[in-house]
Amino acid sequence: QVEGAVLKGQKNPQKLPVLKNIQSCFVYNSARKVSTFESSNRIFNAAHRLIEKAVRSNMQSVFTDCPHREKLGWLEQVHLNGPGLLYNYDLTAYAPQIMQNMADAQHSNGAMPTTAPEYVIFEGPGMDAFAESPEWGGSLVIFPFMYYETYGDDSLIKKYYPNMRRYVDYLKTRADKGILSFGLGDWYDYGDFRAGFSRNTPVPLVATAHYYMTVMYLVQAAKMVGNDFDIHYYTSLAQDIMVAFNKCFLHKDTAQYGTGSQCSNALPLFLQMTQDADEQGNYRPDADLNEKVFANLIKDVEAHGNRLTTGDVGNRYLIQTLARNGEHELIYKMFNHEEAPGYGLSLIHISEPKRLLSISYA
């Protein structure tokens, strides 16, 4: 939008400046590119370029997830896209700023908003889920470990350990017998319905799994800072959450979690929560249960024609769980096509220079 001027050749009764030419510049963060990707697959190469363009568009002073519309620093992108960001860019200057933004946005009671900086306060009927969600706020605890695993630099963990602990303590106040029941869940999951709030997977399952994840990371952080009391306290808390999770969501007769959706089963598999009580009532990893839940996950993907049904949150855990278990051919089938859901769909409808990553696969 241009105001206070007219294009060359247009009427100009007010004698405004005349624009002879306008040049648009692609501006993004100065984080240095550190890797390249090239394969023999046309779809994968184009998808990588598509994603790269989307990432650069969102890498401003704040890492946003929507550069043309909301322009807010939605926090789930930080850890869900964290591995891809760290593989592709040098974030040694950018990541500390992201962490400081989160620390500054943290509320006095330890709560984390869904965006940082928190320029917008989500209030009113139906807006609670947008105000705070464990899958979003959890970036405060999860992302420093991604940074550490990439660079071997534990400074973010040590500096923000008090913030991380305050957030976990806050989540504990929101839990009912170990279960969290608020937030956006597997936002924008895929199916024969209008995308938005999670439909395939229960919100409490996704929220509680992320609660468990943040506590487990905090235990690691406590070991790194040498806080013995916190090590024991949060290890016990993690165990309580894991037990509550399995009691609430595991269907032993079918070896399914929650609704049996891809996200429902992928999350506990990814987090190694597939545990069961022994004769003494102690929960331990159950290899047989893990195998059966994983088999059900594969069956569901195949039942959907080798297509995913996960959303913004579940995508990462689905792909990582399949990859960890050697299902590379299945992952290939899931993305080597030009149908929805998949990146290939947008590649056949729009020419390369104008091609952008859409908000959904539909």
Each predicted region: which residue ranges?
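Structural helix-adjacent loops and short alpha-helical linkers that scaffold large soluble proteins
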Residues: 9-17, 86-99, 106-109, 148-165, ...
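Acidic glycine/proline-rich low-complexity segments
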Residues: 32-36, 40, 334-347, 351
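Surface-exposed acidic, glycine/proline-enriched linker/cap segments
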Residues: 48, 52, 195-200, 351, ...
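The feature captures the catalytic groove of carbohydrate-active enzymes
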Residues: 60-62, 66, 109-140, 172-308, ...
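Catalytic-core region of carbohydrate-active enzymes that cleave or remodel glycosidic bonds
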Residues: 314-344
